[in-house]
Amino acid sequence: MAFEQDLKQVRLPSRPQYPPVNQTRAELLFQKAVAQARAGHWQDSGSGFAEAWRSAPDQPRSAQGMLECALHLARSGIVAPAIDLRSAPRAMGRISIIVCSIDPRRLARLKSDLDRVLRQEDWELIHIADARSLCEGYTRGLLRADGELIVFCHDDIGIVCEDFADRLRRHLAAHDLIGVAGSDYATGHSWHWAGPPHTASWVSLPRPDGALVCGLLGAHGPVLRDAQVLDGVFLAGRRAVFEQIPFDADTFDGFHCYDFDLSYRACRAGLRCAVALDLLIWHQSGGDFGESWRRYADRLIAKFPELTPRAPSAPYRTGALVAESALAAPLYAWIAHWLSAGPSAID
């Protein structure tokens, strides 16, 4: 594969350049979008909020407006315009899902989702019940797996979109390593340290009543390309990627920072890394940043001194909206439609 040559050349990623924040333009666009929403013009309003967000990516109120418009449209049964992807290439081969879990209930719930969305696929679930660390467990799982397409994921996730398998294969045809949350600028101790406009996630949070808190971070969609760091809740790539860039089980012998390490090394090696936002999962956990995490964060910085943060972590501010789980996929379809469109002039 092409990336095998790139592995011989390690490069330090640079910070991507974005247009400067234009608060004046963002405010004009935001107020126009609010007026359109009040008039019930949800499609135009959502598009306007998207433009406002691109002008000022650090303002989550525009993301909130997009979510509100998308929910109104989804509840009305109005479907977002579809992109014809029939000719897009798909990665071929068996799919191996590798999960470390000591919770039978979580594992059974995840397997139920996988059975549903992969029912027409050639796939397998590799369960590691006694992992000493995620690196050790995932490495052992990879040795057991038969698939060409490898997925490492947590056991406390669920899958929202029914065409998950097709989306996964499309993304793996275009990229070497993908996740569902991440950043195109690696700095600090976590994937979201840099903040907007670099960070992106559409991961939702489930509620006890079955609804989802739909998250929206980053004015990108439905893909953030050239990612430098990915969150480990869900990582996928071809088998050769993980064989060429193995998990560092010696340094990260616990359950933190293994994901930052692996994805950052993949980026440094020149692999095509991306955040595939439209894979649409929910995650039960909001993350654990206690003493154990800090210990491994220190190891990460010791291994890669260039990641030493020059500023405090950016606030993790995301648009969030409670929606019925059945409406999450059509809601995010509108988000993808608006964020994929180009900017237009202000009337």
Region roles according to the model:
Residues 80-89, 99, 103-119:
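Short, well-formed alpha-helical segments that are part of the catalytic scaffolds
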Residues 274-294, 299, 303:
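Active-site donor/metal-binding and catalytic loop motifs
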Residues 150:
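Short aromatic/hydrophobic "clamp" motif used to bind/position activated sugar donors
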Residues 229-230, 239, 243-264, 271-282:
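Donor nucleotide-sugar recognition loop
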Residues 158, 162-201:
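Conserved donor NDP-sugar-binding/catalytic core segment of glycosyltransferases
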Residues 131-145:
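Glycine-rich, basic loop-to-helix element that forms the pyrophosphate-binding segment
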Residues 210-237:
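A recurrent flexible, glycine/aromatic-enriched loop bordering the glycosyltransferase active site
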